[in-house]
């Protein structure tokens, strides 16, 4: 009635902009999508199927507006997530050894069951470095804060994260907040890391648990203030932490 044009996107057969394949690589995602009988290949400067699918929504808008497709695809290839939204940062732990690095996924701005599952999938597939730190084995480590506003199902939804295949593939999971305690208790002993009610305590203790070669993902609802944990990890560096999107 209002004359609005509805355009759908996603991976289902009925979507107007249908994502047909996604290849998540170490630092980017390459996807293919079909729209109006044509195919397009595009890249996003971040690993993760969820980023590729969201990118399809942007490309659908560009198509409907009649924008130049080549320019749209080029612009999409330059997009990268910002701080707190999945930014990938390399932390240099020793100024004398360029290999002594720690990789950080800063996803501390928000969290819900779907976005946490997507972030864990990215972490579980991330490459690690071996034989560069004290532990010698590079590890995939998650630091998770409460997912807020889930109502009475909140405790069960937090505990259920332990059963995700991506979670089971991790080496260690540290938890912050009363709701995340349900996940902490559901984890096997080999994966169970630190638990604190507040982010300040985790920020004070976590750096001693990390080592060169590790890949760490920090994610939680904004009110959990996990940006403080991100800052603590960044402060482990020798003054030259590098956002991968900035090169």
Predicted regions mapped to residue ranges:
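A general beta-strand register signal
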Residues: 32-34
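ATP-dependent carboxylate-amine ligase
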Residues: 2-5, 15, 26-27, 37-41, ...
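Short beta-strand elements of ligand-binding domains
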Residues: 8-12
